[in-house]
Amino acid sequence: MDLLQLHCPPTEAYYRPEVFDALDELKQAGKIQHYGVSVEKVEEALKASEYPGVATVQIIFNIFRQRPKELFFPLAQKRDVGILVRLPLASGLLGGKITRNTQFAADDHRSYNRYGERFDRGETFSGVDLDVALDAVEQIRRIVPADVSMAAFAMRWVLQHEEVSCVIPGARNADQVIENAKASDLAPLSSEQMQMLTKIYQDEIRPLVHQRW
């Protein structure tokens, strides 16, 4: 196996060296080439990066979840840890097609976990209240060029950060896969666009989520 990742183990697992010793043994036995973790919080990413064998960290990072770039990204770059970004569109919010009238299926986490009823709230809409998020989406929409989809624009923002190794967007059909792939072909966002997006985050989103994840 090329890469084995532990998906969102409880925080205490990162403080148990024997967990990572076991992964080292799998690597030494030739069962896996590399291993990493998928985390909920920046704290977990920082702790995981202390283990020399950790090759990758998968983390939520998007326009609505910017804390990882403050502490974790510089450390990951220093220690040569690959960053795999999941939920780059904040559960579809940053695709620009969700409205207050959107109905989600009963088995869709955007229906049953909006407030963290089943698992970590940060996994659904990046932990942002839907009404607040939709207002912010409308502000972002005004920044997106007319010939670019909002989804591609949002992922281009993620790719703008050189520490990011790979982006893992979700897709429900082939058209969405094609649209997602266009993000890598877009020109970098301008400094003005980046500043405007930062201001939206600072004003609307940061007070709600920044210290939680």
Each language-model region and where it sits:
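Disulfide-rich extracellular domains of secreted proteins
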Residues: 196, 212-213
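Substrate/cofactor-recognition hotspot
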Residues: 207
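Active-site phosphate-binding strand-loop segment of PLP-dependent enzymes
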Residues: 4
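Beta/alpha (TIM)-barrel catalytic core signal, keyed to glycine-rich beta->alpha loops juxtaposed to Asp/Glu
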Residues: 8-202
